[in-house]
Design a protein with these regions (language model features):
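Conserved, structured core segments of small domains
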Residues: 1-123
Length: 123
Protein backbone atom coordinates (compact mmCIF):
# COMPACT_ATOMS: atom_id res chain seq x y z
CA UNK A 1 0.00 0.00 0.00
CA UNK A 2 1.19 3.49 -0.78
CA UNK A 3 0.11 6.18 1.69
CA UNK A 4 0.58 9.73 0.47
CA UNK A 5 1.54 12.22 3.17
CA UNK A 6 1.27 15.96 2.80
CA UNK A 7 -1.77 17.84 1.55
CA UNK A 8 -0.45 21.34 0.84
CA UNK A 9 2.26 20.34 -1.61
CA UNK A 10 0.75 22.34 -4.46
CA UNK A 11 0.72 25.67 -2.61
CA UNK A 12 2.74 28.16 -4.59
CA UNK A 13 2.31 26.38 -7.93
CA UNK A 14 0.62 28.13 -10.81
CA UNK A 15 -2.62 26.72 -12.25
CA UNK A 16 -0.66 25.41 -15.21
CA UNK A 17 1.88 23.67 -12.97
CA UNK A 18 -0.90 22.13 -10.89
CA UNK A 19 -2.55 20.82 -14.06
CA UNK A 20 0.74 19.35 -15.29
CA UNK A 21 1.32 17.52 -12.01
CA UNK A 22 -2.29 16.35 -11.95
CA UNK A 23 -1.98 15.00 -15.50
CA UNK A 24 1.26 13.19 -14.62
CA UNK A 25 -0.36 11.76 -11.48
CA UNK A 26 -3.39 10.44 -13.37
CA UNK A 27 -1.21 8.98 -16.13
CA UNK A 28 0.89 7.24 -13.47
CA UNK A 29 -2.17 5.87 -11.65
CA UNK A 30 -3.97 4.76 -14.82
CA UNK A 31 -0.81 2.97 -15.95
CA UNK A 32 -0.60 1.13 -12.64
CA UNK A 33 -4.28 0.18 -12.87
CA UNK A 34 -3.93 -1.00 -16.49
CA UNK A 35 -0.92 -3.16 -15.59
CA UNK A 36 -2.73 -4.67 -12.60
CA UNK A 37 -0.17 -3.22 -10.16
CA UNK A 38 -2.77 -0.95 -8.51
CA UNK A 39 -6.21 -2.24 -7.56
CA UNK A 40 -7.58 0.87 -5.86
CA UNK A 41 -6.64 4.40 -4.96
CA UNK A 42 -8.35 7.52 -3.75
CA UNK A 43 -7.63 10.93 -2.32
CA UNK A 44 -8.93 11.60 1.17
CA UNK A 45 -11.03 14.55 2.24
CA UNK A 46 -9.18 17.10 4.37
CA UNK A 47 -11.68 16.90 7.22
CA UNK A 48 -12.25 13.87 9.37
CA UNK A 49 -13.11 12.74 12.87
CA UNK A 50 -11.06 10.84 15.41
CA UNK A 51 -12.59 8.49 17.98
CA UNK A 52 -10.39 7.94 21.03
CA UNK A 53 -10.13 5.61 24.01
CA UNK A 54 -13.17 6.95 25.83
CA UNK A 55 -15.17 7.03 22.58
CA UNK A 56 -14.84 10.78 22.48
CA UNK A 57 -15.14 12.14 18.96
CA UNK A 58 -12.86 15.01 18.00
CA UNK A 59 -12.11 16.82 14.80
CA UNK A 60 -9.11 15.77 12.79
CA UNK A 61 -6.72 15.73 11.17
CA UNK A 62 -5.08 18.36 13.26
CA UNK A 63 -3.70 21.48 11.62
CA UNK A 64 -0.39 21.18 13.45
CA UNK A 65 0.27 17.81 11.81
CA UNK A 66 2.67 18.11 8.90
CA UNK A 67 2.13 14.49 7.97
CA UNK A 68 -1.56 14.58 7.08
CA UNK A 69 -2.54 11.64 4.89
CA UNK A 70 -3.83 12.85 1.55
CA UNK A 71 -4.63 9.54 -0.12
CA UNK A 72 -3.59 6.00 -0.88
CA UNK A 73 -3.03 3.39 -3.57
CA UNK A 74 -3.66 -0.28 -2.85
CA UNK A 75 -1.09 -2.23 -4.83
CA UNK A 76 -0.92 -5.83 -5.99
CA UNK A 77 2.80 -6.55 -6.18
CA UNK A 78 5.04 -9.46 -5.26
CA UNK A 79 7.71 -7.70 -3.21
CA UNK A 80 8.39 -4.65 -1.09
CA UNK A 81 11.11 -3.68 -3.57
CA UNK A 82 8.52 -3.58 -6.35
CA UNK A 83 6.28 -1.34 -4.24
CA UNK A 84 9.24 0.92 -3.41
CA UNK A 85 10.10 1.21 -7.09
CA UNK A 86 6.53 2.31 -7.82
CA UNK A 87 6.65 4.81 -4.92
CA UNK A 88 9.84 6.34 -6.31
CA UNK A 89 7.93 7.24 -9.48
CA UNK A 90 5.35 9.35 -7.59
CA UNK A 91 4.93 12.64 -9.47
CA UNK A 92 4.41 14.49 -6.19
CA UNK A 93 7.82 13.70 -4.69
CA UNK A 94 9.56 16.80 -6.12
CA UNK A 95 6.87 18.95 -4.47
CA UNK A 96 7.18 17.58 -0.94
CA UNK A 97 4.77 14.66 -0.93
CA UNK A 98 6.14 11.76 1.07
CA UNK A 99 5.11 8.21 0.23
CA UNK A 100 4.88 5.63 2.99
CA UNK A 101 5.08 2.06 1.71
CA UNK A 102 3.41 -0.57 3.88
CA UNK A 103 2.54 -4.21 3.40
CA UNK A 104 -1.05 -5.18 4.12
CA UNK A 105 -0.96 -7.83 6.84
CA UNK A 106 -2.58 -11.17 6.14
CA UNK A 107 -3.66 -11.32 9.75
CA UNK A 108 -4.11 -8.88 12.62
CA UNK A 109 -0.79 -8.85 14.55
CA UNK A 110 -2.66 -9.05 17.88
CA UNK A 111 -4.48 -12.23 16.83
CA UNK A 112 -1.19 -13.74 15.72
CA UNK A 113 0.32 -12.99 19.15
CA UNK A 114 -2.71 -14.49 20.93
CA UNK A 115 -2.45 -17.68 18.85
CA UNK A 116 1.29 -17.96 19.53
CA UNK A 117 0.74 -17.43 23.27
CA UNK A 118 -1.94 -20.13 23.31
CA UNK A 119 0.36 -22.55 21.49
CA UNK A 120 3.20 -21.77 23.92
CA UNK A 121 0.89 -22.34 26.91
CA UNK A 122 -0.05 -25.79 25.57
CA UNK A 123 3.58 -26.82 25.11
Amino acid sequence: MLIFRGTDWYKGLSSEEMQQVSDKWMTWFKGLMASGKAVAGNPLEREGKIVGKNRVVSDGPFAESKETIGGYFLLKVDTMDEALSIAKDCPGLPFGIRVEVRAVAGECPMLEEVREAQLAARA
